[in-house]
Regions:
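P-loop/Walker A NTP-binding region and its immediately flanking N-terminal helices
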Residues: 1-156, 162-166, 172-174, 254
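Extended, largely alpha-helical regulatory/partner-binding modules appended to the mid-to-C-terminal parts
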Residues: 54, 60, 87-90, 139, ...
Length: 347
């Protein structure tokens, strides 16, 4: 892959949604917020909860714009680094003054669960009797750490992590805007590496696209750039399970380990393919769906292997590898969980 100049603007900023209709996968939240704005039912405090990279801060900024708040009346604070009582006192002093040129002063506080106990106590007093011209938007990845007395005074929205289908569409659309086309299995790998985060998916895709002048990108190129386990090793594991070839399976695990592959990711990739193999063996009628998810060569490989799979490919096999995925990383030997799974399913 040939190196090219770095993009002028990082993807997660370049493609950050600017209006509600650009927000992906959070229709349940957008609909409520749009309705509230239309009716003029504005809450004095919102609490956005969800995993990292799901769009909480982006939606907070969109909401502030939809409320007609200009930059001079928008205040953002990261509670991870501004978590003390003095930081909250400065907010309490600020809220008493009227907006410069907007109807509302909006305060976006990210990672709000990081506030200290004293800071929470001080902030609660402001939440109990907020000025009419102030709107707080709190964002957190750990809502269980937010005091119930605060949660009860906020309108709470839970952001859902995007599923694989949403992330794959997301990858395809951004790649298209950048003038690239990714093979289906390359799209799948980028989405898997994104791990339920739009921001992480942005970063991985940017890394891939900025490393090549090729307009058509294969899975192998994504593997080379990201250091993901090679698809051949995943195929070797599948064959070892179906054909009951333990040495082949253990060899694949060993090769992945030697290349410093992330065993959690390796097991996840194996699970993705085992599921497809299982569905093909059962003749569930999902052939077309699976064909859209993988490359033509991979679909041919899976179809052929499924025809050879009897009782060696059952639901219990999938369950055993799910357990291996959950167990990976619990010991100082990363590959152990996968090795044990293979010895259990290959008799």
């Amino acid at each position: 892959m040939k190196k090219v100049e770095k993009q002028e603007q990082v993807f997660y900023r370049k493609y950050r949604p600017q209006i509600f209709k650009e927000v992906i996968g959070e229709d349940h939240i957008v609909k409520v917020l749009e309705g509230a704005i239309k009716l003029g039912n504005i809450s004095h405090a919102y609490l956005f909860s969800g995993a990292r990279g799901t769009g909480k801060t982006s939606v907070a900024r969109i909401l502030s714009r939809e409320l007609g708040t200009n930059a001079s009346d928008l205040y953002e604070m990261d509670a991870a680094s501004n978590r003390g009582i003095d930081d909250i006192r400065s907010i309490r002093e600020s809220v008493s003054t009227l907006p410069f040129e907007s109807k509302f002063k909006v305060y976006i506080i990210d990672e709000v669960h990081m506030l200290t106990k004293d800071a929470w106590n001080a902030f609660l007093k402001t939440l109990e009797e907020p000025p009419a011209h102030v709107v707080f938007i709190l964002a957190t990845t750990e809502i269980e750490k937010v005091p119930e007395t605060v949660v009860s005074r906020c309108q709470t929205f839970v952001f859902r992590a995007p599923n694989q289908k949403v992330l794959k569409e997301f990858v395809v659309n951004i790649a298209k805007k950048e003038g690239f086309v990714l093979a289906p299995d390359a799209v799948e790998l980028v989405a898997i590496l994104g791990d339920g985060s739009f921001r992480d998916t942005h970063g991985i895709l940017e890394k891939v696209l900025s490393s090549t002048t090729d307009k058509k990108i294969t899975r192998e190129e994504v593997e080379a750039v990201t250091g993901a386990p090679k698809s051949k090793l995943v195929k070797d594991i599948l064959e070892s399970v179906v054909l009951q070839d333990l040495p082949k399976g253990l060899s694949a695990v060993g090769q992945a380990s030697t290349s410093n592959a992330d065993m959690k990711l390796f097991t996840k990739l194996i699970l993705e393919r085992l599921r497809f193999l299982f569905l093909l063996r059962l003749k569930t009628g999902m052939d077309e769906h699976i064909k859209e998810e993988v490359s033509e060569d991979d679909f041919e490989f899976l179809t052929d292997l499924a025809s050879k799979a009897g009782q060696s490919m059952t639901g219990s096999v999938l369950l055993r590898f799910i357990q291996a995925y959950e167990d990976t990383g619990r010991t100082t030997i990363p590959e152990l969980a996968l090795e044990l799974a293979l010895t259990d399913v290959i008799k």
